[in-house]
UniProtKB/Swiss-Prot annotation:
Lineage: Eukaryota, Metazoa, Chordata, Craniata, Vertebrata
Name of protein: Transcription factor 21
Role, per record: Involved in epithelial-mesenchymal interactions in kidney and lung morphogenesis that include epithelial differentiation and branching morphogenesis. May be involved in the organogenesis of the spleen and heart and in cardiac and coronary artery development. May function in the development and sex differentiation of gonad via transcriptional regulation of AD4BP/SF-1.
Gene behind this protein: Tcf21
InterPro entries in UniProt: bHLH_dom (IPR011598), E-box_TF_Regulators (IPR050283), HLH_DNA-bd_sf (IPR036638)
Biological process (GO), any one: respiratory system development
Length: 179
């Protein structure tokens, strides 16, 4: 999900540049290469590359004749793999940046705290649930709850923990995945 920030635009431009480079490589490929390399390319574009040879989508190899172009075909496959690897690295960089931005926007998480992606998502989810609870309760002090009145993990100070759990579980959107 995009936040609309400047860094999101930069990340998307980086991924698009890598995609354009791979398209140039694909358009320069000679005709006469095996169908296998084009099938691999289509799998990478769909975002669901097959893992190993024993996956659900087993395909029969069409009998191929050995030709002097096999060296060129191998080079084309290697270039295609390198382009796919570069796209995957760029995608992972974008994802890591998004998680680090999310971690820094969570209150009460020190910058040097090492959180897993799952912990970051859980904290963000509980923080959102807490904000929803505040809005639902509509118990503002002059229309505003100061952050000093909030305690870890995101509950209103002085409110019994059991009451908080009841409200959070009633408003939870994540279902069984939340703890």
């Amino acid at each position: 999900m995009s936040t609309g920030s400047l860094s999101d635009v930069e990340d998307l431009q980086e991924v698009e540049m890598l995609d354009c480079d791979s398209l140039k490589v694909d358009s320069n490929k000679e005709f006469g290469t095996s169908n296998e390399s084009t099938e691999e390319g289509s799998n990478c574009e769909n975002g669901s590359p097959q893992k190993g040879r024993g996956g659900l989508g087993k395909r029969r190899k069409a009998p191929t004749k050995k030709s002097p172009l096999s060296g060129v075909s191998q080079e084309g496959k290697q270039v295609q793999r390198n382009a796919a690897n570069a796209r995957e690295r760029a995608r992972m960089r974008v994802l890591s940046k998004a998680f680090s931005r999310l971690k820094t926007t969570l209150p009460w998480v020190p910058p040097d705290t090492k959180l897993s992606k799952l912990d970051t998502l859980r904290l963000a989810s509980s923080y959102i649930a807490h904000l929803r609870q505040i809005l639902a309760n509509d118990k503002y002090e002059n229309g505003y709850i100061h952050p000093v009145n909030l305690t870890w993990p995101f509950m209103v100070a002085g409110k019994p923990e059991n009451d908080l759990k009841e409200v959070v579980t009633a408003n939870r959107l994540c279902g069984t995945t939340a703890s």
